[in-house]
């Protein structure tokens, strides 16, 4: 039998996040290879893919402590590794990932030495990374502010720190010796906010910008109709002035001053007891643009004259409870304002694919090695803070009702909810696996189970804002007993949660056969290795068992896991199959295998 020829490549001169590193072929030193990609059941996301490669180290070529070695100084953790297999002159990807380390083993009285590489895929690379503890801080800094006052200082300091430039200190016109610590004004900003009477910071003028913006969360604390709340920033030639005052109800007046640049407006807003997010931006081409809680407000231009700048540069706040006040030498766009607002509230309403893109963006992993569905059905809102990147990604995948895995070529992949029914390789048979005939063969032993152990007929979906929906299948509960499952999501609405519950109840509530992992290698024809090596997770196959008595067993299935073993002179491949997405039955229909429309929507 002509087994496939495995190859192992290592990028000794590359870095973990390089997209296209230069790989070096080390196949001649390989003693054994094992790879695993997949999951153990139908109800969990795919595991981190792994590989084990045993290298001959008798010459100490792969010993990180051998100072005369060819790769000395380059045998570091997280080097990229690629495993392929060639059959019929075609090289197929088997695994791409990263080396955990370089453990050297000596045996046979020191005459033999090996290095056993434990490897993991991209999910493993990101497994120790966390999403930001504070999204507001993360995104504010990403916009490169001139000044950034968080307002979370201790009152004993008497100073409000600028994260970028100058601290805010007690203004000379104030009789209040300090500021007051208050609860956070936004759900996703940790720490405290600051209530001030009058605080200011002056310093050497910055380069004169031709545009200015600022944003903050705030609550007006004006004690009466004569004391106005205001934020002021000018750099000597231009500036923004925000005044909040009472006249039967609260109003905001905005001005952008300096030269011919000016704008003003009055707009009513919520009572002072309610916090809100405010952003103001302007430039030479337009008047001031005002945003409240991420929404642009149409200003009514007033007749006030432009405020004139004064040296030195000054940032000042009076009579306000504020948090995360940031000032920019740019015109904030609507998207940027929404980013700051959503970061503070911990709510980003976006598709599951957009959320994964956001999460990957907090790491150094390249977006060019990502493939997220272009047709997501889920909109998520809530977002975690300080949680692991990978668990957060899997939570998004659960919200979509899709699958998250790393392909054999190293691409981080998210499928859409119904991709198991509609994607080309999941909807069309890629191989037939049977015990007779000319198709792919499997071993002499096979176990087929038919029970309710993996059936879920009581589905609970948790969603954003501590919401929860529950759906049950009374027919299967009556027939097989109740079996519950809880799915945590970040879905944005009860409607979305109900849609997911309907889908999951249809798939998880189906009574389907289960096949133990099967070995494809015994008696496999040489030409069939090209088919085996071409298989990928979630590919559709047909499984056939022909007993010596009675009818045959023939069912479609999707691949849940693929394991390869390469040793000199032998190759073994084992697959785990799932019939959950290929065998939906209408329980009260006499035609076994008839599709239930509600099963796949």
Predicted ranges, named:
Residues 1-31, 135-174, 179-214, 222-227, ...:
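Acidic, small/polar-enriched beta strand-loop surface segments
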Residues 1-134, 145, 154-335, 340-371, ...:
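Assembly/oligomerization scaffold segments
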Residues 49-51, 95, 113-115, 410, ...:
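Envelope-exposed proteins and targeting segments
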Residues 326-331, 416-419, 580-584:
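Short beta-strand-to-coil "C-cap" segments at the C-terminal boundary of structured domains/repeats
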Residues 109-129, 568-592:
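Short solvent-exposed strand/turn elements
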Residues 94-104, 554-565:
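Short beta-strand-centered aromatic/proline hotspots
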Residues 376-377, 536:
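Non-catalytic regulatory/accessory regions that flank a structured catalytic core
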